[in-house]
Swiss-Prot record:
This is Cysteine--tRNA ligase. The gene is cysS. Binds 1 zinc ion per subunit. Zn(2+) binds at residues 29, 209, 234, 238. A motif ('KMSKS' region) lies at residues 266-270. It comes from Geotalea uraniireducens (strain Rf4) (Geobacter uraniireducens). GO terms for cellular component: cytosol. NCBIfam families: cysS (TIGR00435).
């Protein structure tokens, strides 16, 4: 099966055929850098990071551009509130964004252009639109004339007349059509500005993405991405500006991620119902957050709640525990390396594991080829882990075959890990990290737990089972579960 992607432009899943064989040009709208990023922003960026990684894993050469919107009303407002220059705000939040993305394990895009570093390209594009009759000057502003661009609203499939009728916003009478949007904004006194043929001003939001995407990727490119909320007006306006200027199709595939919701409402700054990436990473491991964000298909809504993150943590822990068990099996009886597994000699459970592990790369590819279905891909990993647990718990001895099977599972999960950017940690240390995090929320210290475990071992040795049970129950009351084995006693948080 070849890769198929859901294209918002056609409303269908289509075969993905790059314009130039072997190469993919992809632009994703970045953040407006006026505040800390929330989990909705994390989702948009993680989703396209995985799409980027998957395309690369298919052997495609991907030119991935993600911008920073570093001039905007929201940035100016915050700068005024804090009494600093606009670029003190944008620079601060670019640094914060970069730090958040690095924590979430994102690969760097090929280019990360900033709007303010592309003013000449923006002015040239606006001038071209005026020269071609698609834009007009209105005082110190320049507007795009939507009626001149016939396919306007082809992405969101809205109707201009209906929208006009429905528009209750106060409309500037000087506009030729109420839906005309601004390409260049005249600077108000005290606002940052750049010189232009229309006076001192700054670019509108939509034009920057047309100018930067076409500069880095050409007039027509393969993929344009962003959150669903950008379909209208942002992407619709990008299409209008770019296609009106170039006379060519702008983008072949439009991909949009679904929202992170809280109580069925979009997480957003304006609603105030948001959690920043930093806040969440204070509490949860970054791999847990990434795991959570990829646990749903990228177009589906994703409900954010403490409970859902805790469930993601438990799910990830289950997989890592299996990876630790695999490592322990390999340590106790290393696979001699490269040995063939004789399938006919396997018992029923081993046979199932052998089959599921062997077919994992193919099933992963099928899931991802179906519009990047990371949820299904993760389901395949859980399925495999169930088989691993069964085989390891039923195995009477650590045989060479068992080690060879474990080595195969480890290698095949490893291949997927690189594309999803999860399961990449050293398993034992990840489990320790999770345990430490949970322990930090307990009302008992790790030292105290370990002291009690030592005391309990001594009590058991002295056959003082009353004291030993007392300690176990006391710890259980603190949500600590003890597990006795031949190697000693280990503990985990319930
Ligand atoms: N709740 C969300 N779920 C998924 N993606 C989101 C969410 N909120 C924003 N995004 C996406 O993040 C990217 C950056 O958005 P942008 O900087 O324009 O956000 P914003 O409009 O400032 O955020 P907010 O919506 O909170 O005001 C866009 O692709 C946007 O669609
Ligand atoms: Zn954009």
């Amino acid at each position: 099966m070849a890769l198929r992607v859901y294209n918002t432009l056609t409303g269908t899943k289509e075969d993905f055929v790059p314009i130039e064989p072997g190469k993919v040009k992809m632009y994703v709208c970045g953040v407006t850098v006026y505040d800390h990023c929330h989990i909705g922003h994390a989702r948009a960026n993680v989703v396209f990071d995985v799409i980027y990684r998957y395309l690369r894993s298919l052997g495609l050469e991907v030119n991935y551009v993600r911008n920073y919107t570093d001039i905007d009303d929201k940035i100016i407002n915050r700068a005024n509130r804090e009494g600093v220059a606009y670029d003190a705000i944008s620079e601060r939040f670019i640094k914060e964004f970069d730090r958040d993305m690095a924590q979430l394990g994102l690969l760097l895009p090929t280019s990360q252009p900033k709007a303010t570093e592309h003013i000449p390209e923006i002015i040239t594009l606006v001038q071209t639109l005026i020269d071609k009759g698609f834009a007009y000057q209105m005082g110190g502003d320049v507007n795009f004339c939507v009626e001149k661009f016939d396919p306007y609203l082809k992405l969101s499939k809205r109707n201009l007349e209906d929208m006009q009728a429905g528009a209750r916003i106060e409309v500037d009478e000087r506009k030729r059509h109420p839906m005309d949007f601004v390409l260049w904004k005249e600077a108000k006194p005290g606002e940052p500005f750049w010189e232009s043929p229309w006076g001192k001003g700054r670019p509108g939001w939509h034009i920057e993405c047309s100018a930067m995407s076409m500069k880095y990727l050409g007039e027509t490119f393969d993929i344009h991405g962003g959150g669903k909320d950008l379909v209208f007006p942002h992407h619709e306006n990008e299409i209008a500006q770019s296609e009106a200027a170039s006379g060519k199709p702008f983008v072949k595939y439009w991909l949009h991620n679904g929202f992170v919701n809280i109580n069925s409402e979009k997480m957003s700054k304006s609603l105030g119902n948001f959690f920043t990436i930093k806040e969440v990473l204070d509490k949860y491991d970054s791999e847990v957050l990434r795991f959570f964000l990829l646990s749903a298909h990228y177009r589906s809504p994703l409900d954010f709640s403490d409970q859902n993150l805790t469930e993601a943590e438990t799910g990830m822990e289950r997989i890592y525990k299996a990876l630790v068990a695999i490592d322990e099996t390999l340590a106790s009886n290393p696979a001699t390396g490269g040995e063939e597994i004789d399938a006919s000699s396997l018992g029923e459970a081993e046979r199932e594991l052998f089959d599921k592990s062997g077919s994992l790369p193919l099933r992963f590819r099928e899931a991802m080829d179906d519009d990047f279905n990371t949820a299904l891909a993760m389901g395949h990993i859980f399925d495999l882990v169930r088989c691993v647990n069964r085989v390891l718990s039923e195995a009477k001895e650590r045989s060479n075959t068992l080690s060879a099977l474990c080595a195969q599972v480890k290698a095949n999960i490893g291949k997927i890990a690189d594309v999803l950017g999860i399961f990449t940690s050293e398993p034992a240390s990840l489990l320790t990290r999770l345990k430490d995090r949970k322990a930090s929320e307990l009302d008992i210290s790790v030292e105290e737990i370990e002291r009690l475990i030592t005391e309990r071992a001594a009590a058991r040795k002295a056959k003082d089972f009353k004291r030993s049970d007392e300690i176990r129950d006391f710890l259980l009351g603190k949500n600590i579960v003890l597990l006795d084995s031949a190697q000693g006693t280990s503990w985990s948080v319930k």
